[in-house]
Structure formats: structure tokens, C-alpha cells
């Protein structure tokens, strides 16, 4: 809730801070979901590597289950997905850190401006 006696500038800064906070939360959620997906892919890859090459392997696509003919191709695809997910996670982490830094800077700027406005109001 925005106080009615603060300047329009401060109200705008507070809205920006709120938007940054929401974006940080969204990125954290995306990172969490990707991290879960990455762990699942790594576990799947570990299990695939334990299997003998002659063991039948099945894969689901949507609601369809089909037999995989080429285990190596499946392992390679999974490796590629893991690498892409790691890159995406790294990118999201950098974005989140950047937004967190901007948020801290904005918090400090808001605090300073609020204190300045209160000093002016107290001396008037």
C-alpha cells in the first residue's frame, strides 16, 4: 500500500521495486522447476548407463509409449538436453542476481529519497 503523502516519484520507485520483486520470484520459480527437471534427466541418464545394450528401452511421447532402437542416440539426446538445461539455469541465475542487485540499489535510493522528503517535511 502506498502512503498518500509521499511524492509521485517515490510512488513510482516503489512500484518499480514491487515489479522487480515479482520478477525475481518468477525467476526463482523457473530456476526451481528447471533444477527439478535437470535432476530427473540426470537420474534417467544414470539409469540408462547402467543398462546392458541389449536391454529393451521404452520412451514416452505424450501418451504414446514406444521402444527405442538406438540406446546411444537416446543417451546423446539426453546429454544434450542436460547441457541445454544447465545453460538455461546459468542464464536464469545471472538474470536473478542482476535483478536482485537492481532491487537493492532501488531500495537504497527509495530509503534515501524518503528520508530526504521527511526531513524537508519536518523543517517546513
From Swiss-Prot:
Molecular function GO labels: unfolded protein binding
Pfam families (alphabetical): Prefoldin_2
Keywords of the record: Chaperone, Cytoplasm
Domain of life, source organism: Archaea
Compartment(s) where it occurs, according to its Swiss-Prot or TrEMBL record: Cytoplasm
GO CC aspect terms: cytoplasm; prefoldin complex
GO biological process annotation, one example: protein folding
Annotated transmembrane regions: none
Record's function text: Molecular chaperone capable of stabilizing a range of proteins. Seems to fulfill an ATP-independent, HSP70-like function in archaeal de novo protein folding.
Family named by the database record: Belongs to the prefoldin subunit beta family.
Subunit structure: Heterohexamer of two alpha and four beta subunits.
Designated name of the protein: Prefoldin subunit beta
Organism for this UniProt entry: Thermoplasma acidophilum (strain ATCC 25905 / DSM 1728 / JCM 9062 / NBRC 15155 / AMRC-C165)
Annotated gene: pfdB
Amino acid at each position: 500500500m502506498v502512503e498518500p503523502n509521499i511524492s509521485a516519484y517515490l510512488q513510482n520507485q516503489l512500484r518499480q521495486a514491487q515489479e522487480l520483486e515479482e520478477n525475481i520470484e518468477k525467476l526463482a520459480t523457473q530456476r526451481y522447476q528447471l533444477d527439478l527437471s535437470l535432476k530427473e534427466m540426470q537420474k534417467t541418464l544414470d539409469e540408462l548407463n547402467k543398462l546392458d545394450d541389449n536391454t529393451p528401452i521404452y520412451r514416452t511421447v505424450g501418451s504414446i509409449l514406444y521402444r527405442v532402437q538406438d540406446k546411444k542416440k537416446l543417451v546423446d539426446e539426453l546429454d544434450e538436453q542436460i547441457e541445454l538445461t544447465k545453460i538455461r539455469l546459468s542464464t536464469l541465475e545471472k538474470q536473478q542476481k542482476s535483478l536482485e542487485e537492481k532491487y537493492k540499489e532501488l531500495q537504497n535510493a527509495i530509503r534515501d529519497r524518503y528520508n530526504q522528503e521527511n526531513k524537508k517535511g519536518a523543517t517546513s
